[in-house]
């Protein structure tokens, strides 16, 4: 922006943020984050001269954090035009949003925004000032992808919007109906311009595979989540640090000695369980998958059911990506002052709607007492709900550390380049794909430099013996890390 008035006009017309005066603070934190994101910065430096994303207009729906600011500026450094919204109503860091807005990027993200604002912002990231269109999506959880597909379906028959199953669906469906009243082809016009999407998280990937199986998916997708340097690092090591940070920021509770239940023992659950055990909690795990349950048992965790644990544990963490894992009846059985939180993507892992009938008392932002009245001979009690059942590490903390997000976001940038460079070819017909192994290994190499790690190099004889090249890839695609 050339002048203060130019910036003020831009923010007023092309952004929705909390406070532009936070931009300098955000810029200082972005500078620190860049020093902790070696993989992402190396990708920026490697490709800047080539401008491989020139011509892209990327709509981004992903937590608007300091680390995401580094991702956005990397995409722009490689030639992309970008518009951004957060994928969660509580996850925005307002100083990060301000810094990005001050740099001239349209951003629509406010910590604590309403659901109405959330879906308005998700629409606005598809509307460009010159009337042009998005041609690439960078998604986290799949809401941006869902919006265009569901809206285009509703253009043909709005009956698909008649039976919402949650408060959020009620608000989303109303927003789509309102947009269709203004422009009956708003969604299909934009949908047909999109060349591909890169998806960040497990929940969004599940959506993509379901859409493809039904024949609904209209463009190719790269599943970034299942890159090894994403899922085995962000999901596991990121959660291992950010979960307990969020719980302690929110409650100041002593974790040691308490019984903590982790629902789900995938990568996120594994990291969560490790973190709680490191603080000397007694960790119990719930699982439906016997393989994951066996892994938990072999790590020394007690494998139980929620029905068994509900009235015994002190801390409950949902990490499944599934629906109503912690139910109203579970919470009704819990101890006074039990802590309940979710580190999965959506808020329906915990049956928050089922306890809305009780009195809620805000302790501080994103920390609430839910007061259960005396019943069945039991006295009144309070349980602590964090982030209203939404993503706790970003609702009550600042999310994963920059270093681990560097791996995830390096994969995102590589995936955007891969899809965009394949436009006009038959390399990626409509479907869901993962990045090839050699790119996964490349990200790992770039990250290792920060840690002063020394890689052993195969001899010619060793490489021949195991049937690989000296440069890699070193493992078959089916290898489980």
UniProtKB/Swiss-Prot annotation:
One of its GO terms (biological process) is one-carbon metabolic process. Its main location: cytoplasm. Its EC number is 3.13.2.1. It is found in: Cytoplasm. GO terms for cellular component: cytosol. Pathway: Amino-acid biosynthesis; L-homocysteine biosynthesis; L-homocysteine from S-adenosyl-L-homocysteine: step 1/1. It comes from the Bacteria. NAD(+) binds at residues 201-203, 235, 264-269, 287, 322, 343-345, 393. Its cofactor is NAD(+). Transmembrane segments: none annotated. It catalyses: S-adenosyl-L-homocysteine + H2O = L-homocysteine + adenosine. Belongs to the adenosylhomocysteinase family. HAMAP family: AdoHcyase. PANTHER family: ADENOSYLHOMOCYSTEINASE (PTHR23420:SF0). This is Adenosylhomocysteinase. It comes from Polynucleobacter necessarius subsp. necessarius (strain STIR1). The gene is ahcY.
């Amino acid at each position: 922006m050339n002048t203060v008035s130019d910036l003020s006009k831009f923010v007023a017309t092309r952004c929705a943020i909390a406070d532009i005066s936070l931009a300098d603070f955000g810029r200082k934190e972005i500078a620190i984050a860049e020093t902790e994101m070696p993989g992402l910065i190396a990708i920026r430096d490697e490709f800047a001269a080539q401008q491989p994303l020139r011509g892209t207009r990327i709509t981004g729906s992903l937590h608007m954090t300091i680390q995401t600011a580094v991702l956005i500026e990397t995409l722009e450094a490689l030639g992309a035009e970008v518009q951004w919204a957060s994928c969660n109503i509580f996850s925005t860091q307002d100083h990060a949003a301000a810094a990005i807005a001050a740099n001239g990027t349209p951003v629509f993200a406010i910590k604590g925004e309403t659901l109405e604002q959330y879906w308005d912002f998700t629409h606005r990231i598809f509307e460009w000032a010159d009337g042009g269109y998005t041609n690439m999506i960078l998604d986290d959880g799949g809401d941006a992808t869902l919006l265009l597909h569901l809206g285009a379906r509703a253009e043909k028959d709005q009956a698909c919007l008649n039976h919402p199953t949650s408060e959020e669906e009620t608000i989303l469906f109303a927003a789509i109906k309102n947009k269709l009243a203004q422009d009956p082809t708003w969604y299909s016009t934009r949908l047909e311009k999109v060349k591909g999407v890169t998806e960040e998280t497990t929940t969004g990937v599940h959506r993509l595979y379901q859409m493809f199986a039904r024949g609904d998916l209209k463009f190719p997708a790269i599943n970034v989540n299942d890159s090894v340097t994403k899922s085995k690092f962000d999901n596991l090591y990121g959660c291992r640090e950010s979960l307990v940070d969020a719980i302690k920021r929110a409650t100041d509770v002593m974790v040691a000695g308490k019984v903590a239940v982790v629902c789900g023992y995938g990568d996120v659950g594994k990291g969560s369980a490790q973190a709680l055990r490191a603080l000397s909690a007694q960790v119990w795990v719930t699982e439906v998958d016997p393989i994951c349950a066996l892994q938990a048992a072999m790590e020394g965790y007690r494998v139980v059911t929620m029905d068994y644990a509900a009235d015994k544990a002190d801390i409950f963490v949902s990490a499944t990506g599934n629906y109503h894992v912690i139910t109203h009846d579970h919470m009704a059985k819990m101890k006074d002052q039990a802590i309940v939180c979710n580190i999965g993507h959506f808020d329906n892992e915990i049956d928050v709607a089922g306890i809305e009938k009780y009195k809620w008392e805000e302790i501080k932002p994103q920390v609430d007492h839910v007061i259960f009245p005396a019943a069945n001979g039991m006295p009144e009690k309070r349980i602590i709900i964090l982030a209203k059942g939404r993503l706790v590490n970003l609702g009550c903390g600042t999310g994963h550390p920059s270093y681990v997000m560097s791996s995830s976001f390096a994969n995102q940038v590589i995936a955007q380049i891969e899809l965009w460079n394949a436009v006009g070819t038959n390399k990626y017909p409509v479907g869901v794909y993962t990045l090839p192994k050699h790119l996964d290994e490349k990200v790992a190499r770039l990250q290792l430099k920060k840690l002063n790690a020394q890689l052993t190099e195969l001899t010619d004889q060793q490489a021949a013996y195991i049937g690989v090249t000296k440069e890699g890839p070193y493992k078959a695609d089916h290898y489980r890390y």
